[in-house]
């Protein structure tokens, strides 16, 4: 009976150890995924700001060109 008791405790102990190792690995994987998501978000934010700046520059140039065309048309009359 003592042999079975020791065996059972050993199995339970090893099960708990392996479970804690699995949970630790799972946490590490989640941390890595979160870090990758953060990096991707930063890249998207950087890309979006560049697109936004390019759009502003294009609108400014188009506005100046339209204003110049209108002033030329008014000047011709």
From Swiss-Prot:
Residues 24-46 are annotated as: Disordered. Expressed by the skin glands. Residues 30-40 have a biased composition (Acidic residues). InterPro entries: Dermaseptin_dom (IPR022731), Frog_antimicrobial_propeptide (IPR004275), FSAP (IPR016322). The modification Valine amide is found at residue 74. Has antimicrobial activity. It comes from the Eukaryota. Belongs to the frog skin active peptide (FSAP) family. Dermaseptin subfamily. The keyword Secreted applies. Keywords: Amidation, Amphibian defense peptide, Antibiotic, Antimicrobial, Cleavage on pair of basic residues, Secreted, Signal. Its main location: secreted. Residues 1-22 form the signal peptide. Residues 23-43, 76-77 form a propeptide. This is Dermaseptin-B8. GO terms for biological process: defense response to bacterium. It comes from Phyllomedusa bicolor (Two-colored leaf frog). Pfam families: DD_K (PF12121), FSAP_sig_propep (PF03032). One of its GO terms (cellular component) is extracellular region. It is found in: Secreted.
């Amino acid at each position: 009976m003592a042999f079975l008791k020791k065996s059972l405790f050993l199995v339970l102990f090893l099960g708990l150890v392996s479970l804690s190792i699995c949970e630790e690995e799972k946490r590490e994987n989640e941390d890595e995924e979160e870090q990758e998501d953060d990096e991707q978000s930063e890249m998207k934010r950087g890309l979006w700001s560049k697109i936004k700046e390019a759009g502003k520059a294009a609108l400014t140039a188009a506005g100046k060109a339209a204003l110049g065309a209108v002033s030329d048309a008014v000047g011709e009359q």
